[in-house]
């Protein structure tokens, strides 16, 4: 099931994304409530074609908090060391986290604004987990019961600021640094979700990977975070970028693809 957040004439709404069996097009079936409240939601009877010019897809959630897993793939840890961005090619033994503010979130087709004070802005394609229930001190065995679904995320990073920003607050938390979307997919094999990235329409093979290669699994990440912080419905965990990242310049088109979810596309503009 795909759950989307969208707007018509500026009013945010939620919908199921469903394919019409007759014309093969995707439609937004509007819902009466907010799926993350735990209350039952019902179709309102309104539906809109996904390609309707009046429809604007929004980020599927505005989280109260966003966690990111640092160097959670061996290939990415080695890549960062090779580029001089990390002192060691070995990933950390324990899960290392950083955070992004909710103000960094943008949706599909929203512009990524490259700050004027940075000369090296990078993409990082990832799978994001969306929490569906309040989670506090949950075990790995029960962690997946607290997941609503998954979406694409681009963990946009100002690489030239990262070395001088040990907490990564500015280099990863600036406005527009967290594109999310296009929707939440509730049915995804999180153990082997394939990630790829296209820059200006061309696939970047060295940026691709699969969650099968995660060092710290999704259940492990949820259990660890919930051991010290309460996760709320709509909170997001960025699970890690699989391999290489690369530079983004003004007018570049950045597309994160996760098999089973779809495409998250954004264009870069200079501040």
Q: Where do the PLM segments sit?
A:
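A gly/proline- and charged-residue-enriched helix-loop-helix capping module
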Residues: 91-109
């Amino acid at each position: 099931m795909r759950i989307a957040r969208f707007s018509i004439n500026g009013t945010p709404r939620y919908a199921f994304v469903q394919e019409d069996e007759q014309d093969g097009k995707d439609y937004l079936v509007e819902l009466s409530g907010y799926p993350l409240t735990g209350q039952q939601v019902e179709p309102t009877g309104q539906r809109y074609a996904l390609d309707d010019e009046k429809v604007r897809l929004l980020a599927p959630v505005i989280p109260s908090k966003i966690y990111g897993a640092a160097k959670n793939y061996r290939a990415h840890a080695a890549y960062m060391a090779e580029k001089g961005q990390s002192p060691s090619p070995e990933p950390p033994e324990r899960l290392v986290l950083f955070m992004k503010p909710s103000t960094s979130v943008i949706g599909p087709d929203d512009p990524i604004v490259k700050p004027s004070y940075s000369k090296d802005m990078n993409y990082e394609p990832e799978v994001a987990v969306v929490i569906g229930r309040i989670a506090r001190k949950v075990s790995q065995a029960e962690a997946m019961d607290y997941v609503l679904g998954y979406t694409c995320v681009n963990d946009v990073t100002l690489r030239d600021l990262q070395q001088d920003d040990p907490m990564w607050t500015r280099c990863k938390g600036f406005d527009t640094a967290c594109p999310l979307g296009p929707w939440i997919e509730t049915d995804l094999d999180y153990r082997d979700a394939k990630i790829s990235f296209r820059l200006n329409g061309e696939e970047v093979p060295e940026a691709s990977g699969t969650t099968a290669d995660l060092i710290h699994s999704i259940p492990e990440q949820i259990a660890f975070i919930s051991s010290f912080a309460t996760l709320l419905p709509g909170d997001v965990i960025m699970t890690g970028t699989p391999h290489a990242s690369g530079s983004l310049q003004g007018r570049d088109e950045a597309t994160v693809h996760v098999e089973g979810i779809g495409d998250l596309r954004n264009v870069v503009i200079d501040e």
